[in-house]
Amino acid sequence: MDSLPKSRLLRFVERAVVLARRAVARYATRYSRKRFTLRQHVVLLCLKGKKTTTYRDLVDELIEMPRIRDALDLDSIPAPSTLCKAFDRLEMAVWRVLLNVSLADLPVNGVTGIDASEFERAHVSTHYTKRTNLTIQQLKTTLLVDTATNAVLDIHVTTTRKHDTQIAPQVVKRNAASITVLTGDKGYDDQKLRRLARDHDIRPLIKHREFTSLHKAWNARLDNDLYNRRNMNETVNAAIKQKFGAFVRSRRWWKQFRELVIKCVVHNVDRALAISCEEVDCSRF
């Protein structure tokens, strides 16, 4: 078995283990039963997100994955309820740290694109959404993407119908140190956002809504080569939805938010593996 080449799934798990060691402690408290570590839970939840499967199916597949279990140092397989409870306990702050850590080895260049998309939250049960009076059945998800590596730098999720210009300042403030150029479509045309970007030494490349000939002139002077790189954000949105699903399975809004961050973490790990394969000959994989 040792002579077999590493599969993409095994390399993903090994990479996720490294990130989990950087992001979380070994155990939640010193009073933990120490049967499974927090890091094992984090990696298994990322694996669940990558395979877009259920807790029960993931546990069933782990039985037939000896090399994956060895990479995780699993002596026994956790029950589905154990993973479900771990997902409840791991707060959003943990997943945001993991998202930041997943960028550590990626050659980001600071040219970013911001755009919003929607994920369905009524996937599991239409009856449930009607019974709970869930009038807004989509989650508005704003991604800040590095256009050089297609990595997700940050994510903002809301259950409301906030305008893009209300969301973007929060994302910019949180990631000011990582942004040199901010590209966005006309939905982000706001003077306050441009002023905020310049205050943080960020070059805003945002198209103006064309109400006057002056606005048309400003748009004509935009650096089109640089501005058009914002399309990478749409590419990332489409890739995440295609590979990991355009929906969330959880019913609680705070778990739905975490689920979307996990999708972004998994996407970043995949991008890191793809870039490393471009630098090294991975044709045998």
PLM regions: where:
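DNA-recognition alpha helix
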Residues: 56-72
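Major-groove recognition helix of helix-turn-helix-like DNA-binding domains
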Residues: 70-90
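Polybasic low-complexity intrinsically disordered regions
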Residues: 33, 39, 50-53, 83-200, ...
